[in-house]
């Protein structure tokens, strides 16, 4: 190859096979896509060692993508169950999967995940550090943290979430500006704790050039984590969040100079009225880099329903610039999600993503809705099921409550507006009282 990374290829005017695949999926000219990749406005996470990958693009002008989180924990250490979740995510066409495993030796699961998955795979190396070395967090050295990141890259992870922006300056801002929920990012809290316990700079910030060496070697996309994302609406858009975002913007430029692709991670919890400005701030401070948001969750009072609170926020966020939505399940804030929780979270996130694509005018987005409208007009139930975002649920609901007439459902019966308008426009009688028609 005459290039090191997708961005390097794009800057050299080389169209990669990954670019060709993404351009075809997005119905766009591959040269236009290449230009966006060269400028960092689109990322195509594609580790050289992820052989089963079916690449996707994330960023400006493309369909909004979704990510599914899964992974093993100390309380739920069941690799087979997590692999079932992987298959569920693949079957439901999630574009990305993040392995958030945080207990024990995680490499076996990570390798199996990457081997079987056509979806983009992301990981958070700091979660793995304690188990990787069997050492207490404070005893892990800066070089050892970087070695864990390299192992994940070597395994084939397409993007690594690293909370590089939690540096001493961001930490000082956090200390001066008390929060209700402090730091709720798992990786961010671990790094902050390590820095405080050792009185040292963030090892990934201090060793950022070495981290870029790793990313360039394997063509890993760097997902710059938001350690200071708000964990409740009271903490949103505060000094700590913005201080870190400024740092992420500076780090983005350094990464691009090395031809390393970047995604910026974002909030978090915030009220509806703050979402649009947060998207604009990120795009401004981080130079148009793709934005990856968790939600945002728009109210804190709905445990058990946070797939809904996040879908509301995600739709608004993606309408105003977010490119990548991390799914949230009904189990958020309560427990590890099961397969049913996963399905609910994926569907909610996909609805939010598609709704935003409609609002943004993404090419081809309306075709799906237009096809559904025509199927409904024609009372073509089979076609409606095929077009449904959750075909199984749509079929089950109709089967559970059968109408006497195939032309209607049990909501309206023969008073169905669609049925009656079709009949009248075709010159037919309505026959409201007869059961034989």
Swiss-Prot record:
Name a single GO cellular component.
cytosol
Which BP terms does GO give this entry?
thiamine biosynthetic process; thiamine diphosphate biosynthetic process
Comment on bound cofactor: Binds 1 [4Fe-4S] cluster per subunit. The cluster is coordinated with 3 cysteines and an exchangeable S-adenosyl-L-methionine.
Annotated binding of substrate, by residue: 69, 98, 127, 163, 185-187, 226-229, 265, 292
Q: Which reaction does it catalyse?
A: 5-amino-1-(5-phospho-beta-D-ribosyl)imidazole + S-adenosyl-L-methionine = 4-amino-2-methyl-5-(phosphooxymethyl)pyrimidine + CO + 5'-deoxyadenosine + formate + L-methionine + 3 H(+)
Q: Where are the transmembrane segments?
A: none
| Binding-site residues, [4Fe-4S] cluster | 409, 412, 416
List ligand-binding residues for Zn(2+). 269, 333
Biological pathway: Cofactor biosynthesis; thiamine diphosphate biosynthesis
E.C. code: 4.1.99.17
Keyword vocabulary terms for this entry: 4Fe-4S, Iron, Iron-sulfur, Lyase, Metal-binding, S-adenosyl-L-methionine, Thiamine biosynthesis, Zinc
Q: Does the keyword Lyase apply?
A: yes
Any GO MF annotation of the entry: 4 iron, 4 sulfur cluster binding
Query: Where does the source fall among the domains of life?
Result: Bacteria
- Record's keyword annotation contains S-adenosyl-L-methionine: yes
Identify which cofactors the protein needs according to its UniProt entry: [4Fe-4S] cluster
Q: Which HAMAP family match?
A: ThiC
Q: Which family does it belong to?
A: Belongs to the ThiC family.
- Function text: Catalyzes the synthesis of the hydroxymethylpyrimidine phosphate (HMP-P) moiety of thiamine from aminoimidazole ribotide (AIR) in a radical S-adenosyl-L-methionine (SAM)-dependent reaction.
The protein's name in its UniProt record: Phosphomethylpyrimidine synthase
Give the species this sequence originates from.
Answer: Clostridium botulinum (strain Kyoto / Type A2)
């Amino acid at each position: 190859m005459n290039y090191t990374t997708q961005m390097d290829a794009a800057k050299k005017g080389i169209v990669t096979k990954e670019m060709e695949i993404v351009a075809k999926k997005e119905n766009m000219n591959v040269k236009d896509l290449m230009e966006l990749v060269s400028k960092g406005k689109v990322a195509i996470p594609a580790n050289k060692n992820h052989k089963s990958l079916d690449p996707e693009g994330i960023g400006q002008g493309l369909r909004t993508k979704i990510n599914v989180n899964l992974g093993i924990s100390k309380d739920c250490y069941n690799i087979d169950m997590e692999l079932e979740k992987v298959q569920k995510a693949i079957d439901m066409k999630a574009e990305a999967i993040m392995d958030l495993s945080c207990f024990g030796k995680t490499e076996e699961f990570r390798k199996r995940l990457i081997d079987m998955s056509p979806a983009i795979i992301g990981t958070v190396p700091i979660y793995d550090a304690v188990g990787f070395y069997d050492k207490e967090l404070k005893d892990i050295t800066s070089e050892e943290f970087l070695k864990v990141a390299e192992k994940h890259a070597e395994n084939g992870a397409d993007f690594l979430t690293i909370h590089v922006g939690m540096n001493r300056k961001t930490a000082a801002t956090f200390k001066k500006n008390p929060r209700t929920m402090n730091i709720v990012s798992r990786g961010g809290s671990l790094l902050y704790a390590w820095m405080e316990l050792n009185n040292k700079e963030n090892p990934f910030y201090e060793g950022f050039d070495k981290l870029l060496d790793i990313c360039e070697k394997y063509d890993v996309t760097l997902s710059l984590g938001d350690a200071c994302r708000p964990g409740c609406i009271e903490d949103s858009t505060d000094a700590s969040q913005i201080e870190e975002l400024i740092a992420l913007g500076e780090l983005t430029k350094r990464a691009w100079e090395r031809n390393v692709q970047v995604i910026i991670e974002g909030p978090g919890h915030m009220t509806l009225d703050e979402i649009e400005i947060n998207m604009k701030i990120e795009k401004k401070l981080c130079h148009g880099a793709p934005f990856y948001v968790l939600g945002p969750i728009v109210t804190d009072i709905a445990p058990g329903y946070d797939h809904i609170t996040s879908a509301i926020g995600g739709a608004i966020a993606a309408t105003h610039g977010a490119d990548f939505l991390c799914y949230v399940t009904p189990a958020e804030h309560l427990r590890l999600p099961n397969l049913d929780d996963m399905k609910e979270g994926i569907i909610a996130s996909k609805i939010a993503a598609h709704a935003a694509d409609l609002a943004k005018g993404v090419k081809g987005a309306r075709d799906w809705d237009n096809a559904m409208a025509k199927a409904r007009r024609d009372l073509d139930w089979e076609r409606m099921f095929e077009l449904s975002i959750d075909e199984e649920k749509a079929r089950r609901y109709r089967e559970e409550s059968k109408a006497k007439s195939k032309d209607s459902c049990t909501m309206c019966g023969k008073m169905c507006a669609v049925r009656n308008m079709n009949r009248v426009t075709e010159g037919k009688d309505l026959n409201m009282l007869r059961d034989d028609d």
